[in-house]
Amino acid sequence: NQGLEGLQTKYGEHRVFDTGIREATIMGQAIGLSMRGLRPIAEIQYLDYLLYALQIMSDDLATVQWRTKGMQKAPVIIRTRGHRLEGVWHSGSPMGMIIHACRGINVCVPRNMTQAAGFYNLLLEADEPSLVIEPLNGYRLKENLPTNIGEYKIALGIPETLKEGSDVTLV
């Protein structure tokens, strides 16, 4: 995977490891690890496949803090990629359903990989579950990285203005 290249070598096979390709199981493992004090980043290969984990995300992950009156937390980060919209599989966009079904989970859709890094750096310190949907086209971009990429953070809920004008685009 382009985004995780070299992490297993750097951090070891006990911290960075493969699982079976069963989205519901990946989500269950991540919830269990997070409730034991770890900070898992669960990867679902493509946005389309997130649908197979949606019930667990909605019913179990998103509600842990609420159901336990704040006594337990599950700070899982779910990482996936999508939004190229080129075919039937691997490129769809079920965003409306995801946003409405996953109340209680931060949903981040970065426009490039630098912005994705800023979200990850922020979310790794958060106590809420989060979903980061990396843009497939982001893997093709050549970006100028900030010198502080390891500490660079993007706050949630603050819009980014790319160009001043009289129109607005809401996502």
Residue map of PLM features:
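Glycine-centered loop/turn motifs
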Residues: 148-159
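Glycine-rich phosphate/diphosphate-binding loop of Rossmann-like nucleotide-binding domains
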Residues: 168-171
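Thiamine diphosphate
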Residues: 1-139, 143, 149-151
